[in-house]
Structure formats: structure tokens, C-alpha cells
């Protein structure tokens, strides 16, 4: 009989296109500056929090800690696409299993 592994975490992975401020620290021509627009950014990561005010994504995980965190205001998200779901088990984080 195969022993069923206990799921430690399950996270959905998303691709997100979002709007952010653009800034320039050099001198710019007045007319050229009028053509400037906000930036469209791209993030791919695992969704941790989603609410009406923001989405929190992370890109790395080890045990109970995450890294490479991006918090995007929900109102700035232009497009979001679910890629897949990642299921992690306790033994995925045990050194001797790799």
C-alpha cells in the first residue's frame, strides 16, 4: 500500500501585468516628456494574499519562509493569468531528499 503524503502547502502560480509609476532623473525635453506614460510591469509568482486592496506574490520558498515578495495594489493590475498550481510536501524541504 502506498503511503499518502501530507500536503504542506498549495499555491497557485500567476502571470501578472501591472501598471507602475515611471520616473526619470535626467533633463528631458518638455514635448518629449508629454509623451511619457506609466510603465507596464510583468511579474510571475505564487499568490499568497488576494484582497480588494492588494495581491501579494512570492517567488521563492524554504520551509516556512518566503522570499522575493512583490505586493501589487489590486487597482494597478491590468491582466492576471493563472498558470498552474504547485503542491509542496514536508519532504520537499528535507535536505537529504535531494
Place the predicted regions along the sequence by residue.
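Conserved RNA-binding domains used in RNP assembly and mRNA/RNA metabolism
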Residues: 2-98
Amino acid at each position: 500500500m502506498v503511503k499518502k503524503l501530507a500536503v504542506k502547502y498549495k499555491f497557485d502560480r500567476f502571470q501578472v501585468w501591472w501598471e507602475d509609476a515611471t520616473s526619470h532623473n535626467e533633463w528631458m525635453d518638455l514635448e518629449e516628456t508629454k509623451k511619457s506614460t506609466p510603465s507596464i510591469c510583468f511579474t510571475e509568482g505564487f499568490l499568497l494574499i488576494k484582497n480588494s486592496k492588494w495581491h501579494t506574490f512570492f517567488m521563492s520558498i524554504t520551509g516556512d519562509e518566503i522570499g522575493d515578495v512583490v505586493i501589487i495594489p489590486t487597482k494597478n493590475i491590468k491582466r492576471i493569468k493563472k498558470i498552474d498550481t504547485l503542491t509542496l510536501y514536508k519532504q520537499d524541504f528535507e535536505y537529504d531528499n535531494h
